[in-house]
A protein has these predicted regions:
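Polybasic/polar functional segments that serve as interface/processing modules
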Residues: 2-142
Length: 142
């Protein structure tokens, strides 16, 4: 307890965690999430929790209050994650000093990705190919 001007107050300090994982661990691993969505296209990362939650709800028609769902928004060298914990939102932010994220810049939509795709994204790899290899049928070759 500290005393200032005869008022007593306590400042509780608690590390925010999600399922026992620290916030910095969360953006490096995809564990603990039921689903992961990325916002393809461009997002204004000056937006805070309310602005990002409104993108999820109104642009993508998804529920930002669905528990254990990670929504990702990306700039070239920074990424924000939004998670509803059941009683509050948690906003995660990561900025790279060197390099950039290889983010799908297709039309503005929410893409559900796998934990493996998430790991690739965090390593700077492209997860949505611009020119995917197409299946060839033998009858088309002759």
């Amino acid at each position: 307890e500290k005393e200032i001007s005869s008022w007593k107050y306590r400042i509780p300090f608690q590390t925010r965690s999600f399922h026992g994982l620290e916030a910095s661990w969360m953006l490096n691993n995809a564990t603990g999430f039921r689903k992961i969505y990325i916002a393809a296209g461009y997002t204004d990362l000056r937006r805070g929790i309310d602005g990002l939650a409104s993108i999820v709800k109104f642009n993508f028609q998804l529920d930002p209050y669905e528990k254990d769902i990670l929504f990702l928004f990306c700039g070239s060298d920074r990424i924000k994650g939004l998670i509803w914990e059941g009683d509050r939102f948690l906003l995660l932010y990561k900025r790279l000093e060197l390099g950039s994220f290889s983010w799908p810049r297709t039309k503005e939509e929410a893409l559900e990705i796998t934990p493996e795709q998430y790991q690739a994204l965090m390593q700077g790899l492209e997860i949505v190919s611009r020119h995917p290899i197409q299946e060839v049928h033998p009858k088309d070759l002759l």
